[in-house]
Amino acid sequence: MIADSTTLRRLFRVPVVLLVGALILTAGAPAEPDSPTWHVYFSPNHGATQALVSALDAARTIILVQAYSFTSAPIAKALAEAHTRGVDVQVILDRRETGTKYSSADFVAHAGIPTLIDGAHAIAHNKVMIIDGETVITGSFNFTTAAERQNAENLLVVRDRALAARYVENWRTHAAHSSRYAGR
């Protein structure tokens, strides 16, 4: 039997009305709670170090760090304070940090923070922090005073569990071939 046009209109009317209604109801809906959020900072002198320190101060469970150059006292202090309040803090540094005069490598190692040296590459040029498995901080911004006060740098703070999981996986890959640093 072939349906007439009136029957066809009736059959399609309900799904179309439901679809249009759903679109209207969700048009102004807020983003999903797990939708990525981000903030970007630039330097010199536009708050990148303070943004980093604030994120570290808010950490609850774990902070994983990969740093090429690490001489910032405020960042090193924030990591040590997080460690003291029970946050699992672990650091991977480029091999040159063990001989740099103003490196924070000794400070964090002597604070009891597991510190690893990634000597498997020409340079371990990562500038990454992963906080609580949900926040990734990365960019050209080295964890140094010069990056905050003198250099043209960028720092991106992204809250996204899926992205953080990828960064954690990469962090673990580098940790596996790095060696423990006890400090000088």
PLM segments and residue spans:
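Bacterial Sec-dependent signal peptides at the C-terminal "C-region" and cleavage site
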Residues: 12-36
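Primarily the HKD phosphodiesterase
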Residues: 52-114
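N-terminal secretory signal peptides that target proteins for export/translocation
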Residues: 1-9
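Structural recognition of the beta-strand scaffold that forms the well-ordered cores
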Residues: 39-41, 64-66, 90-93, 116-117, ...
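Short N-terminal segments immediately surrounding and downstream of signal-peptide cleavage
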Residues: 31-52
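Surface-exposed, polar helix/loop patches in the mature regions of secreted/periplasmic/lumenal proteins
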Residues: 103-150
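Signature of lipid phosphatidyltransferase scaffolds
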Residues: 131, 136-184
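Solvent-exposed loop/turn segments at secondary-structure junctions
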Residues: 62, 69-73, 95-99, 121-124, ...
